[in-house]
Amino acid sequence: MKILTGNSNKHLSQKISKFLKNRLVNSNIRKFADGEIYIEINENIRGNSIFLIQSVSSPANDNLMELLLSIDALKRSSAKNITAVIPYFGYARQDRKVVPRTSISAKLVSNLIEKAGADRVVTVDLHSGQIQGFFDIPVDNLFATPIFARHIKKKLKKNNIICVAPDVGGTARARALGKLLNVDLAIVDKRRPAVSYTHLTLPTRWDVG
């Protein structure tokens, strides 16, 4: 097993490498003058299982291309299998058509990752669970809620805590956290009158328990 890091999650990759006592794959990632991304694997990885750690966070377009080109480079370097570890899965918000003439970017990005050569995807708290169904390869969607709950219990007093879901889509996550903490739940009514405008209505009552 070997670990390759992209530019978006270097600190996380280094911590994982140190924890596993498994050094990072030697690679060269740079840009040409026109902004085109260049990736080179500088060591023999033939027959190895590779974990590529790269988020599709800001700048999302650059990080997405870096992810895809890294997968392609690993595939062409004869890696045995490639697991794309994507802590933040960008373009996941657009998981369905909310207006008639728009793209479903989550599906397109899923297709690109699979076509590039990934054999498995590991991510954290997908925007919506159905995105796992956009892939024909295994997808492990990990949940950070138990980790947050442990941290909150250590840092805050229970009688000062209320879990708030920012919209209906976040209710399941907020409820799961509220249950672990045994605290109340509030749900915010979120509406988008326009693409760049969001209207929030704060709750007037709490769901206790």
Regions of interest found by a model, annotated:
Residues 198-204:
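Conserved small/polar residues in nucleotide/adenosyl-binding loops
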Residues 208-209:
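Hydrophobic alpha-helical segments, chiefly the membrane-spanning helices
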Residues 2-11, 15-169, 175-179, 185-186, ...:
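Active-site loop-to-helix "anion-binding N-cap" substructures in soluble metabolic enzymes
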